[in-house]
Amino acid sequence: MTNIVVVGLQWGDEGKGKVVDWLSNNADAVVRFQGGNNAGHTIVIQEKTYKLNLLPSSILHNNKLSIIGNGVVLDPYALMSEIDNLRINGININTQNLVISESCPLVLNIHKEADTLFEQLRQNTIGTTNKGIGPCYADKISRRALRVCDLFDKKDILYNKVNNLLNYHNLLRQNFNILPIEASKLVDELLDIAPKILPFVKPVWKVIHDLTQQNKTIIFEGAQGTFLDIDHGTYPFVTSSNTIAPQAFVGGGINLSHSSCILGVIKAYTTRVGNGPFFTEQKNEIGKSMFERGNEIGTVSNRERRCGWFDAVLAKQAIILSGVSGLVLTKLDVLDQFSEIKICTQYKYDGVIYDYIPASSYVQNNLEPIYETVPGWKENTFGSVTYEDLPKNAISYIKKIEEILKVPVYLISTGPERNAMIIINDKFLK
């Protein structure tokens, strides 16, 4: 099996975790390459639900290497909590099956506090998860962030780095009349957590290089979705990292000479958590039905997801940005009850027709979707195990999506369970 990059083609929550978990069975390693514990992957195995935030989905498999790449911002306390919770549930996690990049920036409590403060300052709130992700990435770009490798330092060297970080954060706190953080206190906290983290730490770029030299199969697991990308998303209602497929090379530390199949995961309808434009949103009984049937609650935020019709304009743009080879279509069963289904094929604003998402947030907020209507199937697809099991109109819907997007559907997820997957085209598995 070739290397595979798995990315979401909407606003996240497409079902990437389940897909990566399923693919992991035939892979040697899985790499998380961006984001932090603001991402959430839900995986169901034999009716038991696992919720992952930082750990790659492969951690639930035996004899698979899970890698947290340099593109991830790492909350060490959240990571240890996640590890401890999985161990309680019988999952074996050790230095042989988990590796953490020495270059990961550290997410600390000061970042979470800063996240909350910055959200208060905004005229229009973004709907951040308040996990400290944005402020940590800001520190990284400003070259003052603490990184995992700093936990190896002697106390006096670490103190100087902490003090440099606090020169900024204490100034911010002062403006909000919040007491400053003492450098010595933060140093002690870091030295306390360090022994739990450091055994997992290695130069991840070298680990991945060695795997490629041995012709091992690697999956690169994206978090969030294309239109939460800091550069290509619906700015400013985006995350703080790049979420599209090319980031796998940067955030994992693998060079471009290694060929990969790029799988785009996409729901049969569209959802979004938090604020920001949503062109096909249904604030009516249709959206309510999608929400209820899809159990659309955010894994991390625990907020209700907004729901709407499938947006082919959004999907086409995402496919181009990541160079998607094939699609994984998820949650088809949520549409089972509709007698007719709509697909957005264009937008309209001020007399102009758009076949892409304009960058202007003002224009985005005023786009009107143009729909094509197709017949529904009013039959149950949940748990279907073969393509032939699907209703005729459900197959027609899938083919319509392929026709519009000009990319084949490789897999269809028919339920939350690990093996609830229909394989249409398996060439990427060879």
Curated annotation (Swiss-Prot):
Positions of the catalytic residues: D13, H41
Record: residues binding Mg(2+): D13, G40
Gene Ontology cellular component list: cytoplasm
Any GO MF annotation of the entry: adenylosuccinate synthase activity
Ligand binding (IMP): D13, E14, G15, K16, N38, A39, G40, H41, T129, R143, Q224, T239, R303
Keywords: Cytoplasm, GTP-binding, Ligase, Magnesium, Metal-binding, Nucleotide-binding, Purine biosynthesis
Enzyme Commission identifier(s): 6.3.4.4
Cofactor requirements of the protein: Mg(2+)
Annotated cofactor note: Binds 1 Mg(2+) ion per subunit.
Residues holding GTP: 12-18, 40-42, 305, 331-333, 413-415
SUPFAM superfamilies (UniProt xref): P-loop containing nucleoside triphosphate hydrolases
Pathway where it operates: Purine metabolism; AMP biosynthesis via de novo pathway; AMP from IMP: step 1/2
Predominant location category: cytoplasm
Pfam families documented for this protein: Adenylsucc_synt
Catalytic activity line of the entry: IMP + L-aspartate + GTP = N(6)-(1,2-dicarboxyethyl)-AMP + GDP + phosphate + 2 H(+)
A biological process from GO: IMP metabolic process
Protein family according to the UniProt entry: Belongs to the adenylosuccinate synthetase family.
Entries under HAMAP family matching the protein: Adenylosucc_synth
Subunit structure: Homodimer.
This protein's name: Adenylosuccinate synthetase
Protein source organism: Ehrlichia ruminantium (strain Gardel)
High-level lineage: Bacteria, Pseudomonadati, Pseudomonadota, Alphaproteobacteria, Rickettsiales
